[in-house]
Design a protein with these regions (language model features):
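Activation-segment/catalytic-loop signature of the eukaryotic protein kinase fold
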Residues: 32
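Activation segment signature within eukaryotic-like protein kinase domains
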Residues: 69-70
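Protein kinase catalytic-loop region centered on the HRD/HxD motif
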Residues: 73-85
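C-terminal lobe helix-coil module of Hanks-type protein kinase domains
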Residues: 128-231
Length: 262
């Protein structure tokens, strides 16, 4: 990417913005610069493993542990959103669990820089966690992060991603058109409230998701004290959520994204 002037400019701008973020659930960025044409970013050193590695090790997480991790991730993202920064690449690989149990979100500047007009929004990430609007190459905002958080939470409680396939295109189309198998199908006794939170986060229609990350946090905390409660509000299915038609141009955009990797 260093040969791409637009990317370099975007990377420096967004990484510097990320450097202004200080939060217990974010890997802090201390410095951004270049040394004789080599661009670098100095980040907080965290001893630990990624959430992806942790899930692979345990198979699936307990409800309490998954909810606790989701709350911490949400708090980090909420702090970023309050500063006008959208991550756009939320996935277990970009979430670190430190040796003392603290959960931190990383790669803010890189993720945002990769969403410049000259680079596909999926270049830096995995389509397994991308929102429908991202795989279509459209506008993405805080609600895109909410969708990706929902997919991540789904994987934590089931040990699998909801949409998979042999190619990026196949997975992208599933995000756009295929109904998600409820996580309770794979995890017995999954609390009703937590399943509803996951389903609300991962609605294909942006308007049917949570409005803000703080609303996600509130419901996640509520689910810990009222696991079977019916307090998550899901709006009725609209036409946008029922049918998504992919144009030839959009299909071409999807095909130009890198091969899928989970």
């Amino acid at each position: 990417f260093r040969e791409d002037a637009t990317f370099v400019k975007k990377f420096r701008s967004e990484a510097q913005a990320a450097a202004g973020l200080t939060h217990p659930n974010i890997v802090n960025v201390f410095d951004v610069g270049d040394d004789e044409g080599v661009y670098y970013i100095v980040m907080e050193l965290i001893e630990g493993i990624t959430l992806k590695e942790y899930i692979s090790k345990k198979g699936k997480l307990s409800v309490k542990e998954a909810t606790s991790i989701a709350i911490q991730v949400s708090m980090g993202l909420e702090a970023a959103h309050s500063h006008g920064i959208v991550h756009r690449d939320v996935k277990p690989q970009n979430i670190i669990i430190s040796t003392d149990g603290k959960v931190k979100v990383t790669d803010f500047g890189i993720a945002r820089a990769a969403s410049s007009n000259t680079i596909s929004s999926n270049v830096m990430g995995s389509v397994h966690y991308s929102s429908p609007e991202q795989v279509r190459g459209g506008y993405s905002d805080e609600k895109s992060d909410i969708y990706s958080l929902g997919i991540t939470l789904y994987e934590m409680v089931t040990g699998r991603v909801p949409f998979d396939g042999d190619t990026t295109v196949a997975i992208a189309i599933k995000h756009l058109q295929e109904e998600m198998v409820p996580p309770s199908v794979y995890t017995e006794n999954l609390p009703y409230s937590l399943e509803q939170i996951i389903l609300k986060c991962t609605q294909k229609s942006v308007g049917r998701r949570y409005e803000k990350m703080e609303d996600v946090i509130a419901d996640l905390k509520h689910s810990l004290i009222d696991p079977q409660g019916n307090f998550v509000t899901l709006s009725s299915v609209d036409n946008e959520a029922k049918t998504v038609v992919i144009s030839d141009e959009e299909l071409g955009e999807i095909k130009n994204t890198p091969r899928a990797s989970s």
